Amino acid sequence: MGKRDYYEILGVTRQASEEEIKKAYRKLALKYHPDRNPGDKDSEELFKEAAEAYEVLHDAQKKRIYDTYGHEGLRGTGFSGFRGFEDIFSSFGDVFQEFFNFGFGAGGQSRTAARPGDDLLYDLSLTFEEAVFGTEKEIRLQTLTTCEECNGSGAEPGTRETVCPVCQGSGQVVQSQGFFRISATCTRCQGMGKVLVSPCKTCNGQGRTRQSKTVQVRVPAGVDTGTRLRLRGEGESGYRGGVAGDLYVRLHVNPHEFFERDGDNLYCKVSVSFAQAILGDQIEIPTLDGGRELKIQPGTQPGAVIRFSGEGVPRLRGYGRGDLFIEVEVKIPTRITPRQEEIVTEFMQIEKEKSGEKVRKWPWSKRKDREKKSMAESTREART
């Protein structure tokens, strides 16, 4: 039975990048590793098959030959795959060190004492204006910071580390399992290769202590709820001098009493009287930049939208600003004075005449007419 296609084995395309090939191999190596499948012959074969495919596809020269001539071309170079696990672990010791955090055989690399600190997440609330125009905030948080007594080393001042007596400084101990050897983390030094003769009393050998610290956060203009700001190195300090983690600030923006936001655009509503809508007017409206004049054109209809370009929210990743959209609402009064009634009635009379219709008076208009007629008759009777 002929060999399977190497790309098919790893589950990648012929255009896959080196990183994609490595990622695919890691997945298969984890799945079919002998330690996870003891005594499973099928898994052993799949493990070897994946290793052979990776050996070819991660090597630029072998990959070029394979892409051009296939398996036959590789045989011409003397490549015949791996004979057993020892060949695989010997060839890919550094790869397995990266994949599994431990090595195989005596070639495994020792771990360093330092370990990076964890990342932190902080929730920060902003006003609407702060989110739109940007601001600077000072936040205070409790976190692990570098021990000032030992300067992060974990050792009592004046003392130093010594080589671990168990692993002799390698950070690993070798365990034999069948026909291959596995290097596991040394439990005495936790893989560090060194032990403290006299741990720092302030931090108990950790190289860091929990402290309160303040951090300045620069919030750029145009952020919104859900935006995350990354502050490199402002997370937890590393263990025994390791690099610090990062601080992620998650933003929450409070709503505005007048404006609503959608992306970089702002929306609001203004109310005008029906007389202003008919005749037009000049009114003042609030904007994020201060008050400004808004001209209501004669005959403005309810629901009309007026747009002001460039008066919205500054674009977070770009130049310029969004737009401001103003919707006009026309207020209809529920109570009017007799004088207003006369004017509106006359206006309606004109409108009806223009369209050839007869004016129908409002109920309260008829009542007023009856009252006026009655008063006139009473006046005539009094005179006689």
Curated annotation (Swiss-Prot):
Binds 2 Zn(2+) ions per monomer. Residues 5-70 form the J domain. GO terms for molecular function: ATP binding; heat shock protein binding; unfolded protein binding; zinc ion binding. Keywords: Chaperone, Cytoplasm, DNA replication, Metal-binding, Repeat, Stress response, Zinc, Zinc-finger. Its cofactor is Zn(2+). SUPFAM superfamilies: Chaperone J-domain (SSF46565), DnaJ/Hsp40 cysteine-rich domain (SSF57938), HSP40/DnaJ peptide-binding domain (SSF49493). GO terms for biological process: chaperone cofactor-dependent protein refolding; DNA replication; protein refolding; response to heat. Residues 352-384 are annotated as: Disordered. Zn(2+) 2 binds at C164, C167, C186, C189. CXXCXGXG motif repeats lie at residues 147-154, 164-171, 186-193, 200-207. It is found in: Cytoplasm. NCBIfam families: DnaJ_bact, PRK10767.1, PRK14294.1. PANTHER family: CHAPERONE PROTEIN DNAJ A6, CHLOROPLASTIC, DNAJ HOMOLOG 1, MITOCHONDRIAL-RELATED. The J domain is necessary and sufficient to stimulate DnaK ATPase activity. Zinc center 1 plays an important role in the autonomous, DnaK-independent chaperone activity of DnaJ. Zinc center 2 is essential for interaction with DnaK and for DnaJ activity. This is Chaperone protein DnaJ. It comes from Syntrophobacter fumaroxidans (strain DSM 10017 / MPOB). The lineage of its organism: Bacteria, Pseudomonadati, Thermodesulfobacteriota, Syntrophobacteria, Syntrophobacterales. The gene is dnaJ.
